[in-house]
Amino acid sequence: TYIVCFDNQNARFEFPEKKKLNKTLQDLLEPEVDDKYFLSDRILPTILSDGTGGYKAKSEIDLKIARPLCATMAKMHRACQDNYVTQKGKIRRLTPRECARLQGFEDSFVIPVSDSQAYKQFGNAVTVNVSRAVAQSVKSTFINLGEWVD
């Protein structure tokens, strides 16, 4: 959710139009990843189960569009169960680099923290492309008001 406010009643802000996505999750995957990202035989039944209690959901693997990363819900049962992909016949989780790509970060962006911290940070990040588009619309609104100074 994005909220934009102006202290000027003459401001005529319009959110950017939706853009058609031209990439799928599969396009953002790394061709080779470390073994640590693959799920062990011990955890696999839990991931592939339909959940328990009020958290029942059919597990889906290899989605074209990733589910929200849910960093703030990481301790909730199966909160992020669907962000898994298959590679070489095995199921794995997304790497921090792949999560960064999902949020619009370039591959040149340095990830100087542990994987667990990176997952939290990218899960809580604001998508780069959306932020840029909203900021450009804010700038256009200020320009139209004659209040923009470079």
Annotated model-derived regions:
Residues 131:
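Acidic-aromatic/histidine active-site loop/patch
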Residues 1-75, 86:
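Class I S-adenosyl-L-methionine
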Residues 16-18, 144-150:
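Short, flexible loop/turn segments with low-complexity composition
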Residues 135-146:
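Short, hydrophobic alpha-helical segments
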Residues 74-113, 118:
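FAD-binding beta-loop-beta segment adjacent to the flavin cofactor pocket
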Residues 30, 67-70, 100-104, 136:
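Generic alpha-helical structural context detector
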Residues 127:
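A helicase ATPase "motif cassette" and its flanking acidic/Ser/Thr-rich regulatory loops
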